[in-house]
Every structure is written in structure tokens, then in C-alpha cells.
């Protein structure tokens, strides 16, 4: 069929050359000779994906004096020969069309020259979780100034909420603590905690980032984190850090080992800022650190690049109508807080409804994930491994308990992950059931879980004490 390609190229007035592996050294030499002998000013390579060898062919063209953007690839492999391998005639017609359109596009291409613009050698990293902190450290260790912006009073993101690490089961907070302190103490990293990005202006290489430092109403220079204000504060609200499993005060710090170890007053819930006469925290503070007159501060920083590392949120479990919105139906992050020694129960596994030890716990994976018709179409990737970790930690905390795990597929990605899951089955007695859960509802003191085991083709009903949902990320 290559004669038809020759006919096409001759009809368009272009030079035609054929080589079985054009990306090879002989193929590249053939391109060089064709350019030199025929005084070409543009090249179309009819072969594979641009992601593989576009730079290769453009480099050859540039070396022969052709503008790199006058070199195009007509992808007749992935777009044509592979998907239509069983229809050679139709594939040939499609290949001819792809080549024709690529040639016509190339005739209209303009010669481009990459621009070099001055770069402000500073970077703003938005998000103080583990990804944002790692990015900040990598950039700072390369010698550049970094502004790390975190909306919460302390650094760490979701990582400091976790109980343990997958595979090692080491304490998550202890594992991440050295990184947090390295960020805080790095001379090239300036941390804007309890701050938010208001606006970004500018262009590539030069951005102006407007930041809002929210008023903490606590003078950090005077406060020694004694915690007396928090202890005496009369206003309690659900704790965001503990996923609403317990309460915090209107004046609070995220968690006892928070870095920065800074107290803030939540003006949305503080009685004093909502029309009531209350100054208890100010009255009991021995250092006079409470300052109700503080205002938000707007600042601008000039940077050449931004890194957005704003983390994730879990798909709300309330969106799953088939699963009852019950106190003992938790999402994965809530269960992490129950497992954590710094959590609302001090690491003791207790049902939120009555504080009893759950003897049967059902873990449901892919809740809201891999469901394109109703929820999210994608796999959240991390759920299989953190569910295995949670189930193992549950069994070690409650040896007489039983953990059931409903799954679709076990995607144990990463070195040692498959063995970790197998260890849970063999050593801790985790029971994996392949199938979806159709309904969860309260049945007296128990939670009825209706599902199916597709391997045995049987309907399953489990009366559990607690259900943990691996929600889509």
C-alpha cells in the first residue's frame, strides 16, 4: 500500500520517503538527506504517537535549519493501524486522510520561536499538607524562596489525622512531624498559616499573589499555649479535626501537637463576636494574649510560579441514599480518628452511638467510586490499602472482633501492598467478600448490611455493630 502513499504525496507536490523505523538512526539520516537534497522547509512524519518521538523529529528538522514547529507527526499507528488491524482497506483510507489533513495543517503553521521571559525566582505553594510541604522543601532545597500558604492554623493536612501508615503501621503523626519541623525551620520557607489566597494576577514568570492572613484574636508572641483559654471557654462546636466525632471550643488549636502550636478564636462561633457578652478567655489568660481587636491582614507576594497542592475531600456519605445516615456508619477518615491515640476516644475503638466496643465491623469499598451512572466514575486508588490497614488495626485493638470487607477488586498497587493485604487475611482473619452492598439500615442495636458475594453467587446479610465506608476521593 506504500505506492498509494507515494501517489498521494506526488499529488500534493511533496517529497515522499519510506523507512520501516523512521525514529532509528538510518531513518533520521534519511530525513536529513531529504531536507538537504530537496531544500525542504517542512516535514510530516507518518508514524507513531507524537508523545514518543515528536521531539526527536523536531530536533532533526531544527539541525537542518527548519523551524521545529514546521515538523508535524501524522499518527497513523495509534489512530489507525492498531485500532483497525482487521480492516486494512478502511485503515489505509483513514491513514491517507490523516496524512492529507496533517500536510494541510502544516502548510498553515507559523514559524514559532520560544520566548525567554524574566523569572521571579520565588514560588508560592498553596496547601500545607504533605504534598505542599514536600513541594516547598524540594524547591527551597534548590535555593529558591518559598511562600507556603495553609488555610488551617497548623500544617499537616489530612496526613496528621491518620492513625498509622500503610505497610509499617507506624504512627502517622510521628512520621510526618520531622517534615513539619523542617518546613517551619527552613530559612527559605515562609509559612502563612491560617491564611487564604484572595487573588492571583500576572503572567508566566511574574505573578502577584494577594494573601489574607486571618485574624487569630490571639497574640502569638504573648501566648505560651497553656490552654487555659480553651479549658474555660463556654462555647463548644463540632471538631473539624476529629470529623465531628467530638467537640472543640470556640478558642482552640487543631490538635495538641499542632505546628505551629497556635491558638485561634473561631469568630463564626465565638459568643463575643456574635452579640453576646463573653470575655472569659480574655479574663483567664495569664499573659494578656487575647486580642479581640485584631483584623485580617492583606499582603502581596511576588512569585514566578505557583504550586497548587490543596489536597482532597471525601465524597459525602449522605449522597448514598441506600445507606442510612446513622451515627455508627462512618467514613474512612472518621474511623482513622477512632483508631488514632490522639483521637476522640484515645485510640479505643468505640461506637459513636453508645460507646460500646464493636464486635463486628463491615468495611465497604468503592462507595461513590467506579459508579459513573450515579456518582464518580473513577477508582480513588488509595481505598484498598487504607481499608486493609484499618481492618488490621481494628483486629489488633479488638482481637475477638470480626472484620468483613466488601470489595469489587483489590487494587494493591505498590511494593509490598499485595503481601500486606494477604497478611491481614492470614494473620488477622479478615474476611473479604467480593460484591457490592445494596443497603445499610438500622435494625435495633445492630446495623443490617445487605450485600452479595459474587464468587459464591449468594446474597449476604450481616448484622454489624459498625460500618466503615471507603468514600470516593
Residue ranges and their predicted role:
Residues 1-16:
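Single conserved hydrophobic/aromatic residue that forms the stacking wall/gate
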Residues 14, 33, 59-75, 89-97, ...:
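N-terminal glycine-rich dinucleotide-binding loop that anchors FAD/FMN and/or NAD(P) in oxidoreductases
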Residues 24-26, 35-38, 81-86, 91-156, ...:
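Rossmann-like dinucleotide/flavin-binding elements
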Residues 419-473:
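C-terminal catalytic lobe of FAD-dependent flavoproteins
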Amino acid at each position: 500500500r506504500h505506492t498509494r502513499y507515494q501517489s498521494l504525496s506526488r499529488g500534493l507536490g511533496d517529497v515522499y520517503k519510506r523507512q520501516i523505523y523512521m525514529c532509528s538512526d538510518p531513518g533520521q539520516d534519511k530525513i536529513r538527506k531529504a531536507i538537504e537534497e530537496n531544500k525542504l522547509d517542512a516535514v510530516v512524519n507518518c508514524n507513531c504517537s507524537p508523545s514518543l518521538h515528536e521531539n526527536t523529529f523536531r530536533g532533526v528538522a531544527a539541525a537542518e535549519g527548519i523551524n521545529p514547529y514546521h515538523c508535524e507527526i501524522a499518527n497513523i499507528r495509534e489512530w489507525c493501524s492498531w485500532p483497525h488491524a482487521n480492516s486494512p482497506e478502511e485503515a489505509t483510507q483513514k491513514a491517507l486522510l490523516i496524512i492529507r489533513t496533517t500536510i494541510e495543517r502544516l502548510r498553515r503553521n507559523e514559524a514559532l520561536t520560544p520566548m525567554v521571559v524574566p523569572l521571579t525566582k520565588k514560588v508560592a505553594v498553596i496547601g500545607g499538607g504533605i504534598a505542599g510541604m514536600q513541594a516547598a522543601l524540594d524547591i527551597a532545597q534548590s535555593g529558591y524562596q518559598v511562600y507556603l500558604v495553609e488555610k488551617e492554623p497548623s500544617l499537616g493536612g489530612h496526613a496528621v489525622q491518620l492513625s498509622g501508615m500503610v505497610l509499617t503501621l507506624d504512627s502517622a503523626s510521628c512520621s510526618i512531624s520531622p517534615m513539619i519541623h523542617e518546613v517551619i525551620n527552613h530559612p527559605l520557607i515562609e509559612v502563612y498559616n491560617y491564611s487564604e489566597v484572595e487573588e492571583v494576577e500576572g503572567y508566566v514568570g511574574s505573578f502577584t499573589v494577594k494573601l489574607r492572613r486571618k485574624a487569630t484574636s490571639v497574640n502569638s508572641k504573648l501566648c505560651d499555649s497553656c490552654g487555659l483559654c480553651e479549658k474555660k471557654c463556654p462555647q463548644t462546636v463540632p471538631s473539624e479535626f476529629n470529623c465531628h466525632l467530638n467537640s472543640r471550643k470556640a478558642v482552640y488549636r487543631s490538635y495538641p501537637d499542632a505546628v505551629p502550636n497556635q491558638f485561634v478564636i473561631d469568630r463564626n462561633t465565638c459568643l463575643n463576636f456574635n452579640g453576646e457578652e463573653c470575655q472569659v478567655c480574655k479574663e483567664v489568660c495569664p499573659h494578656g494574649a487575647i486580642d479581640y481587636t485584631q483584623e485580617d491582614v492583606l499582603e502581596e507576594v511576588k512569585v514566578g510560579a505557583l504550586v497548587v497542592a490543596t489536597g482532597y475531600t471525601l465524597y459525602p456519605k449522605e449522597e448514598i441514599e441506600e445507606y442510612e445516615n446513622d451515627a455508627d456508619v462512618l467514613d474512612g477518615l472518621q474511623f482513622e480518628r477512632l483508631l488514632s491515640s490522639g483521637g476522640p476516644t484515645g485510640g479505643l475503638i468505640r461506637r459513636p452511638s453508645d460507646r460500646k466496643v464493636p464486635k463486628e465491623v463491615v468495611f465497604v469499598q468503592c462507595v461513590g467510586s467506579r459508579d459513573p451512572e450515579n456518582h464518580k466514575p473513577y477508582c480513588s486508588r488509595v481505598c484498598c490499602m487504607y481499608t486493609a490497614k484499618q481492618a488490621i488495626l481494628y483486629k489488633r485493638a479488638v482481637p475477638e472482633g470480626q472484620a468483613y470487607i466488601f470489595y469489587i477488586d483489590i487494587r494493591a498497587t505498590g511494593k509490598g501492598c499485595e503481601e500486606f493485604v494477604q497478611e491481614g487475611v492470614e494473620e488477622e482473619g479478615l474476611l473479604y467478600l467480593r460484591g457490592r452492598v445494596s443497603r445499610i439500615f438500622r435494625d435495633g442495636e445492630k446495623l443490617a448490611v445487605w450485600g452479595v458475594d459474587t464468587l459464591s453467587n449468594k446474597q449476604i446479610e450481616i448484622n454489624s455493630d459498625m460500618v466503615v465506608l471507603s468514600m470516593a476521593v
